[in-house]
Structure formats: C-alpha cells, structure tokens
C-alpha cells in the first residue's frame, strides 16, 4: 500500500490542477466495495511496483481513473503508454462502448485514438457572491493546447463520430 501511495504522489505532485488527495486505502476500498465495476492493476519490474492504474466500469463505459507511475522507469519502459493500451484491452474484453481517459496528457492519449470532447461543468456555491466569482474564474479556464495525433484513417474517424 505504501508503494501505491508513493506512485500516486509522483503523479499528484506533477499535476497542475488538484481537487483533493486520495489515500492508497481509497483504491482498495473501491475495489472491495465495487468488485468488478472497479479495476486496480499494478505494473511490476523485478517484483517492484512501478505503476498502477484504476478505472470504473458502468453503463457501457470505462472511465479511466487515477494512475501512479515511477517516472524514473516511465521513459525506458513506456509505463504510461502501456496503461493506455491496457485500458483499451480491458474495454474490448468487457465490450464497453466508450472509454473516458480524462482531461490530462491529451497528446499521448491521442496516439491511441483518443480525442477531446467538450464537457459541461456545473459549480454552485450556497451563497450568491461566491457564485459570481466562480462564474468569472471558470470563464478563464481553458484546456491546454496540445498536438492532436490521429491514430485512425479519415474514413474510420468519420465512422467513430457517427
């Protein structure tokens, strides 16, 4: 559990936007309570945990959740890229219709066929004054620019968009 927590922290510490911090216990509780609706998979190198991925299965979706990565090994062993392929493998195996990879690291996700989808965000405070401030602040929040890769031929893309 400590190794998982350290890997989670490596990713968390690099994140530009943080809503809250999870404990390693959270992942194990999710697995225990959600059973097959939650996946938690470890990546090992010489019996040492060097990465983990988690995700939720629901209503024909696989929602990629948090990951943890030992960045010292990521470049040489392409840990994160392997995680993306594993999400795809699990989705095919479980016959899910869509995968949500989340809103970070968009360029590498586009190499496996992911593309950005605009999301609606509803935030409301109980008091009026903070609501006005939130509206102003969130008007400035824009996705980071990235180089969108195209993993499919044009014809295949058109079929995906249907």
Positions of predicted regions on the chain:
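Short, flexible segments with low predicted structural confidence
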Residues: 63, 80-81, 137
């Amino acid at each position: 559990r400590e190794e998982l927590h350290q890997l989670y922290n490596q990713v968390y510490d690099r994140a530009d936007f943080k809503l809250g911090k999870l404990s390693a216990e959270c992942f194990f509780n999710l697995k225990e309570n959600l059973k097959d609706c939650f996946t938690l998979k470890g990546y090992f190198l010489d019996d040492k945990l060097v990465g983990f991925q988690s995700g939720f299965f629901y209503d024909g979706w696989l929602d990629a959740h948090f990951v943890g990565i030992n960045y010292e090994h990521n470049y040489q062993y392409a840990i994160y890229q392997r995680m993306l392929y594993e999400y795809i493998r699990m989705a095919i195996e479980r016959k899910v219709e869509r995968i949500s990879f989340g809103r970070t690291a968009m360029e590498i996700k586009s190499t496996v066929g992911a593309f950005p989808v605009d999301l609606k965000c509803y935030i409301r405070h109980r008091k009026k004054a903070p609501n006005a401030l939130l509206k102003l602040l969130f008007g400035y929040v824009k996705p980071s620019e990235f180089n969108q890769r195209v993993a499919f031929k044009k014809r295949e893309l058109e079929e995906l968009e249907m």
